[in-house]
């Protein structure tokens, strides 16, 4: 998303007066990075993992809203089922945690109140008094929506919110000169909560554990080693619970590739941005002792003449989507195969600074940085420190299509997203609403859909084995009236698993003390090289699409000589001076 966001910002109206060309290079045939999704031959959505958008993702929502407004599908593509951003996203106010109380377990799902605010629209930054009033309103919402006595679990949520507000005030995190949230980045979130008076039951409970699950906050993916920056924890608690717009969560009504990246591909193409698929970045070459970028070395995976004419999208139910396999009729004999999934029949390409390009935005995933920028990492201590301290973790996910509906299965919370489960998957989301976008024969189609995800510990068995183990151990808890107990269970219509170990697919963590080692968009130390990605210091130092979007906005600002904060929505108080 970071590179797409930068291209979007740079290609605003009149860009031809500022630049000769803008070109985005993408490995393979699918745009979107960790947010990419495709469609199987039968129309099923295949994701990297579970994606929900939080209600404070103003910059990401603004980008999507601008994209849909520009495409104007109501006029230009009236048969498309998703024509506006409101068609693409639906509020998801039901959020829960799975609780472990001694030998007893149970699911607590609360309905967070919705509001009339619109994500992506500018709004005044809330002060502490406003946050306190919102916290009181949130507590009342939770009491009203809980199916239990208020004292059983709601008190933990109230304790969390009040502790965060009390601690923010005590530490002066919103006070000018207080250092912002970066002042407590060196602490673990749980440690900080205890220091400011949170009950141990709250800190060890499902709600806090769910926040760690949300950011895959476990060293090396090991759930016995929770680690999550207090700076980000406080920032996230405030923005997620007290500063959301419309709803706390928003879910997409089709795959993320369908509703975000396919429209962006279309809009960027319409703007005249060059979209060069099948290009893998191999290396950044420098000169002047590493102070200046000299060239970008790429491998062209198919011949250039094929790239020039390749259209990556197909229509599923009249919705433009990326296919799970490259389109053979567009590539001919150059189509990747199982024997050679990443061919290099197009040869190598060298983009020379001053001859082919003037400025470069590096927007690969952090895991790929040591590979493509090996010389820079070797030459610059700040890059080495970033690679050492800003860590990544692989993730795993499973999608389960079920033959019975959720009521028959006994799942009492349609549409809910629940965290705090135990290994091997810590989060389960009801995604049955996506079945309408997948189509299929009504008499044979699945009737429920669940997404599972978690960090992937070192040495973990294959995800198919862990999914099998999960169903065997957790089916009764999730679907007490009879869910599938194995991948071969006839109650399971289909399944799809994903192990995200590719360097660019690894999730960027926010471990205590790591933010100080992130580089800013303008901080590469290499002339002609600007940085973008959810791994840079962008003011929201978290692995999420909002951070990636902000980083792209900032990268564009650097290239155009504008302040980093220009066009960034939301409070930039991470390191307030």
Predicted regions and their residues:
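Dinucleotide-binding Rossmann-like beta1-alpha1 core, especially the glycine-rich loop
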Residues: 42-152
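N-terminal Rossmann-fold NAD(P) dinucleotide-binding loop
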Residues: 3
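Short, solvent-exposed loop/turn and secondary-structure capping segments
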Residues: 33-37, 223, 227, 371-376, ...
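Glycine-rich FAD pyrophosphate-binding loop
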Residues: 11-40
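A short, Lys/Arg-enriched amphipathic alpha-helix followed by its capping loop at the start of a domain
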Residues: 6-20, 267-273
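Active-site/ligand-binding neighborhood in enzyme catalytic cores
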Residues: 147-347, 352
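C-terminal segments that line or cap access tunnels to active or ligand-binding sites in enzymes
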Residues: 176-178, 184, 235-266, 279, ...
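Short, glycine/acidic-rich hinge or "gate" loops at secondary-structure transitions
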Residues: 73-88, 277-278, 564-574
């Amino acid at each position: 998303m970071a590179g797409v966001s930068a291209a979007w910002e740079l290609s605003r109206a009149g860009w031809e007066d500022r630049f000769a060309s803008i070109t985005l290079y993408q490995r393979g045939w699918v745009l979107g990075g960790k947010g990419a999704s495709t469609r199987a031959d039968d129309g099923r959505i295949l994701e990297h993992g579970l994606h929900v958008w939080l209600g404070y993702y103003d910059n990401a929502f603004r980008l999507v809203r601008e994209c849909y407004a520009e495409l104007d599908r109501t006029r230009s593509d009236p048969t498309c089922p998703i024509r506006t951003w409101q068609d693409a996203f639906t509020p998801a106010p039901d959020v829960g945690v799975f609780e472990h109380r001694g030998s007893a377990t149970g699911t607590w799902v609360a309905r967070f109140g919705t509001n009339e605010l619109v994500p992506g629209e500018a709004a005044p930054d809330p002060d502490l008094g406003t946050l306190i009033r919102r916290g009181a309103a949130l507590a009342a919402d939770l009491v009203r929506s809980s199916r239990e006595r208020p004292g059983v679990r709601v008190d933990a949520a109230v304790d969390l919110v009040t502790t965060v507000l009390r601690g923010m005030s005590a530490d002066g995190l919103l006070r000018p000169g207080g250092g912002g949230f970066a002042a407590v980045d060196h602490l673990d979130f749980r440690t900080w909560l205890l220091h400011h008076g949170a009950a141990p039951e709250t800190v060890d409970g499902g709600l806090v554990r769910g926040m760690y699950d949300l950011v895959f906050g476990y060293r090396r993916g090991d759930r016995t080693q929770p680690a999550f920056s207090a700076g980000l924890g406080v920032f996230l608690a405030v923005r997620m619970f007290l500063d959301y717009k419309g709803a706390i969560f928003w879910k997409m009504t089709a795959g993320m590739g369908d509703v975000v990246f396919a429209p962006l591909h279309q809009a960027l193409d319409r703007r005249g941005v060059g979209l060069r698929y099948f290009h893998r970045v191999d290396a950044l070459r420098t000169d002047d002792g590493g102070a200046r970028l000299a060239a970008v070395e790429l491998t062209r995976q198919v011949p250039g003449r094929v790239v020039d004419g390749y259209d990556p999208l197909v229509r599923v139910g009249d919705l433009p989507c990326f296919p799970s396999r490259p389109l053979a009729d567009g590539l001919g004999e150059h189509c990747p195969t199982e024997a050679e999934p990443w061919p290099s029949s197009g040869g190598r390409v060298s983009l020379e600074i001053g001859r082919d390009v003037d400025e470069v935005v590096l927007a690969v995933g952090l895991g790929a940085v040591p590979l493509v920028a090996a010389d820079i990492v070797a030459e610059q201590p700040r890059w080495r420190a970033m690679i050492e301290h800003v860590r990544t973790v692989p993730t795993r996910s499973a999608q389960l299509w079920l033959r019975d509906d959720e009521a028959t299965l006994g799942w009492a919370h349609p549409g809910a997203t629940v965290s705090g489960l135990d290994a091997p998957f810590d989060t389960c989301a009801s995604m049955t609403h996506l079945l309408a976008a997948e189509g299929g024969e009504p008499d044979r189609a699945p009737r429920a859909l669940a997404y599972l995800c978690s960090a992937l510990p070192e040495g973990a068995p294959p995800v198919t084995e862990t999914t099998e183990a999960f169903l065997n151990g957790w089916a009764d808890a999730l679907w007490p009236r009879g869910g599938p107990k194995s991948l071969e269970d006839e109650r399971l219509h289909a399944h799809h698993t994903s192990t995200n170990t590719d360097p660019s697919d690894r999730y960027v963590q926010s471990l205590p003390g790591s933010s100080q080692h992130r580089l800013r968009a303008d901080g590469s130390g290499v002339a002609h090289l600007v940085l973008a990605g959810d791994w840079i210091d962008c003011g929201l130092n978290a692995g999420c699409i909002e951070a990636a979007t902000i980083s792209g906005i900032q990268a564009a600002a650097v290239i155009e000589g504008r302040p980093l904060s220009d066009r960034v929505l939301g409070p930039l108080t991470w390191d307030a001076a």
